[in-house]
């Protein structure tokens, strides 16, 4: 089957221009067509009502996210494996209040909803301190950092938590903590982590890198069955062999990715990111009555 690819985890971002938005849509269409799970960052875009080209006003991020919602659904319906996507926004973006409610099926304009996308919010340490102190919180233009609106940090936090209780989302990504824990080589290269993926477990740099090239982050994920731990615990090559296999999968993606995934193949080549997790821990502990 030539339709699928060995990688299904991608992270990208939209630039603050019509070309940048259309490029993101186009890339996401091709990723979804191959069954990709996508996490897209929209925090670079100016908010609704900000000036464009000195004469017009931007319509904000929500209409563009709505188009991404429709594109993902349309492409997924024709695929063997459904592609899915998540969208991310920082907590200081001027449209954050509407963004929190974007998956809520009731209330507001149905044309400004994205019910088929998942969504997440990048939380900063300064915002959490403002919540703790019950301070005001400035919502700033991504273009020039001018204050567009000021809200109660605690009220915004309560609104966010209410949405999570009632709808299960948005995801929360504590971006300062994530960036503090970046590998040293990423810090030295000035690579910033702005977003996460469809399931919010991957944190990799996206956008323009220190070489002036665009990155669509790629990660190859797998897991080991901990229930079978005693079958391989003394095999010193077990984990290294798995990691080598995952790196081979990355190479297969690099070798076979189509031109429409050029930025993803470039990112995979530069980073070769892999992740190995574990499943069935409870099944390991229950027979021996060990506490979980």
Model-derived features: where do they sit?
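Function-dense linear segments that define catalytic or interfacial modules
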Residues: 1-53, 61-64, 75-78, 164-273, ...
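Conserved small/polar residues in nucleotide/adenosyl-binding loops
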Residues: 282-288
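Acidic, His- and aromatic-enriched active-site or binding-groove loops in soluble protein domains
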Residues: 65, 107-120
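Glycine-rich loop/turn
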Residues: 52-87, 103-108
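Short active-site loop/helix that positions an aromatic residue
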Residues: 96-104
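Polar, glycine-rich mid-to-C-terminal structural blocks
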Residues: 101, 121-158, 165
